[in-house]
Regions:
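Bacterial N-terminal signal peptides that target proteins for export
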Residues: 2-25
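Intrinsically disordered, low-complexity segments enriched in Ser/Pro/Gly/Ala and basic residues
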Residues: 3, 36-37, 152
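Short, amphipathic alpha-helical segments
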Residues: 19, 26-32, 59-60
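Boundary at the C-terminal end of the N-terminal hydrophobic targeting segment
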Residues: 28, 34-42
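Compact, glycine-rich, soluble single-domain proteins
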Residues: 41-175
């Protein structure tokens, strides 16, 4: 009787090659999807828009919580705000500083994540807190005049027990 290894080698090659081909295809699709998502997200960012790390930052305290806040203190930065961001770190937010004590309204156009906002007087006293849905053009206005507003991830103020009447510490001087 004659024995040939050729059929056995063919079966083993197929048994190894097929799973490798499937894994390779899945990896290629995953890479293509990730690259496409990054490109699509990058295309949404308008020319001249600041990246998150390009804003000046301050450390604020609300009760026992330390907040890393990007500061938007000029018209261009306030207009961009947190637009185009897809996430925030747990205690990350954006502080809007205004040169005048007035009612400053916000909307969520091109803002991809839902946010909470606290409106404050110059001394850091929180006057109003509001919840804002992503990608809407509804106005969110405080009932009181103020000079600062702090945007955080949706529900942040509620879950931390931060309420109107409490004070925010570490606010930068107004210009």
């Amino acid at each position: 009787m004659r024995f040939s290894l050729r059929p056995l080698i063919a079966r083993c090659t197929l048994a190894v090659a097929l799973p490798l081909a499937v894994v390779g295809t899945i990896a290629a699709l995953t890479f293509t999807t990730a690259a496409t998502s990054s490109v699509a997200h990058a295309q949404q960012m308008p020319p001249g828009a600041k990246q998150p790390g390009d804003f000046p930052h301050v450390k604020l305290t609300a009760g026992m919580f330390v907040i890393d806040a990007a500061v938007a203190a000029n018209d261009a930065d306030r207009e961009q705000g947190l637009m185009y961001r897809t996430q925030l770190a747990p205690n990350e937010g954006m502080l809007f500083a205004f040169g005048e004590n007035a009612v400053h309204c916000f909307w969520m156009k091109n803002t991809l994540i839902p946010l909470s906002i606290a409106f404050m007087r110059a001394d850091g006293t929180i006057t109003d807190i509001d919840e804002m849905q992503a990608e809407t053009t509804n106005n969110h206005c405080p009932r009181n005049n103020g000079t600062y507003a702090l945007e955080m991830s949706k529900g942040w103020f509620t879950t931390k027990g931060i309420k109107p009447g409490m004070k925010m510490q570490g606010l930068p001087p107004l210009q």
